Amino acid sequence: MVLIKEFRVVLPCSVQEYQVGQLYSVAEASKNETGGGEGIEVLKNEPYEKDGEKGQYTHKIYHLKSKVPAFVRMIAPEGSLVFHEKAWNAYPYCRTIVTNEYMKDDFFIKIETWHKPDLGTLENVHGLDPNTWKTVEIVHIDIADRSQVEPADYKADEDPALFQSVKTKRGPLGPNWKKELANSPDCPQMCAYKLVTIKFKWWGLQSKVENFIQKQEKRIFTNFHRQLFCWIDKWIDLTMEDIRRMEDETQKELETMRKRGSVRGTSAADV
């Protein structure tokens, strides 16, 4: 049995713009989560081609300890809180799988994303069979809705309801921004449809951990896309060549940061 949710994130940018914005923001957010022996280690970042699909393959290791809830830390053996993330980015479709060597086949997180030029109105964009699709909970994330943000995560300079882009003049996003976007032919629009499938097979803990992970994924998607929009002036003029160069630099920075300093970034809100 697995727990499946589809998160829909509407943004006032084009699918083409988002490709650069997403990669820029991933690199920046990785730095904010790395330090003191924890965080993100990039093993591979290279082009791939398989079965007619072309894109960028990444393999990252997440060193987590303080970033999981206390009830998991209590039962997790030393060294088991290391997770492997493999991602195939054949934009506008992306697939990410997170595994753990200690739990082997009893655990995975799979995130499949389609980026579409609409306002999140497409149904079953991932083409699931009807019986599976009936079990999927759809969650709409509004990047301008402060009530969807954990109080500890809130930053005024990463609030789309307050931010206005100098370069694009987009923002601030009011309470009815999605309706306004639908009626504004001049402003681009898109939706990230993120299908998250979670398996955690551990007697007595399965539903608690699966629900915790889904809650954390929503938190990550919400914070990440708020940042992405508020950082638009930093990435809107970048090319994919700029991004690849930045990723190489970030990979080296992360290695240094992880080995030094104190633990940084998001910690687990216990459930």
Curated annotation (Swiss-Prot):
Molecular functions per Gene Ontology: phosphatidylcholine binding; phosphatidylcholine transfer activity; phosphatidylcholine transporter activity; phosphatidylinositol binding; phosphatidylinositol transfer activity; sphingomyelin transfer activity
Swiss-Prot/TrEMBL catalytic activity: a 1,2-diacyl-sn-glycero-3-phosphocholine(in) = a 1,2-diacyl-sn-glycero-3-phosphocholine(out); a 1,2-diacyl-sn-glycero-3-phospho-(1D-myo-inositol)(in) = a 1,2-diacyl-sn-glycero-3-phospho-(1D-myo-inositol)(out); an N-(acyl)-sphingosylphosphocholine(in) = an N-(acyl)-sphingosylphosphocholine(out)
Expression across tissues: Widely expressed in various tissues including brain.
Keyword Mitochondrion: no
Pfam families given in the database record: IP_trans
Subcellular location: Golgi apparatus; Golgi apparatus membrane; Endoplasmic reticulum membrane
Residue positions, PTM Phosphoserine: 262
Modification comment: Constitutive phosphorylation of Ser-262 has no effect on phospholipid transfer activity but is required for Golgi targeting.
A single GO BP: retrograde vesicle-mediated transport, Golgi to endoplasmic reticulum
UniProt xrefs under CDD domains: SRPBCC_PITPNA-B_like (cd08888)
Modes of activity regulation: Phosphatidylinositol transfer activity is inhibited by N-ethylmaleimide.
Gene Ontology CC: cytoplasm; endoplasmic reticulum membrane; Golgi apparatus; Golgi membrane
InterPro entries cross-referenced by the UniProt entry: PI_transfer, PI_transfer_N, START-like_dom_sf
Family: Belongs to the PtdIns transfer protein family. PI transfer class I subfamily.
Role this protein plays: Catalyzes the transfer of phosphatidylinositol and phosphatidylcholine between membranes. Also catalyzes the transfer of sphingomyelin. Required for COPI-mediated retrograde transport from the Golgi to the endoplasmic reticulum; phosphatidylinositol and phosphatidylcholine transfer activity is essential for this function.
Protein name (record): Phosphatidylinositol transfer protein beta isoform
